[in-house]
Amino acid sequence: FMENKIDIIDVTLRDGGFTCDFNWPMLFAQEYYDLMSTLGVKYVELGYWKQTNKSQNRFFNLNMDTVREVTGGKGRNNVSVMIDYHYCSKDLNDYPTNEQNEIKMIRMTCRKDMVKEGYEFAVKLKKHTGLVIAFNLFNTTNYTDNELDSALDIVLKSDFDMIGFADTHGHLNLYEDIFRYEHFLHRIIQSD
């Protein structure tokens, strides 16, 4: 008998940041973070870590000062931040490590033409930071089945804590595509 466990990653502040140019009022972000933490949400994703390509605002260009301002320095170790491999810094020293107690996870998105390089960077990032690393293949509705299988051939060699698919632009119709993705999800589960 295997016990199923579901951990929730709330991405409202990060994903919703696109609606407000990543410029949430700090009081709202603080109250939202506290609510999600009180409800037992395992990870609360605040925004993008030190990226500036799409916005100069603080929830797209997160740093430790902003993270601590949102969390109140409570040290709950439940913050997630996202990086987009295409745009992120490739200097490992630009990332938080497990020596702090706010950020627990880095989720990295990767385009299909960068999976190999993104994988190699994420492996180094995991080793350097000691944090939970989630690897997201995004825009997956633009992949062929062979491309998704090839991407999984690469990333399943890792010890990433999570591997996921992202429907970046809202084209995924699980009603129609569930059986297609079922194959790929089984590959991930069986590799564990």
Protein language model features and the residues they cover:
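Charged helix-capping and loop-helix junction motifs
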Residues: 25-27, 60-65, 147-153, 177-184
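Active-site beta->alpha loop and helix N-cap motifs at the rims of alpha/beta catalytic domains
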Residues: 37, 43, 48-151
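Short, well-ordered secondary-structure micro-motifs
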Residues: 20, 92, 145-147, 174-177
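Polybasic, low-complexity association/targeting segments
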Residues: 2, 145, 161-164
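Conserved, mostly hydrophobic/aromatic
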Residues: 16, 36, 106, 163
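Alpha-helical scaffold segments that flank or form the walls of functional sites
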Residues: 28-42
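N-terminal small/glycine-rich loop or linker at the start of catalytic domains
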Residues: 2-21, 76, 128-138
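Catalytic alpha/beta core domains of metabolic enzymes, predominantly
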Residues: 162-192
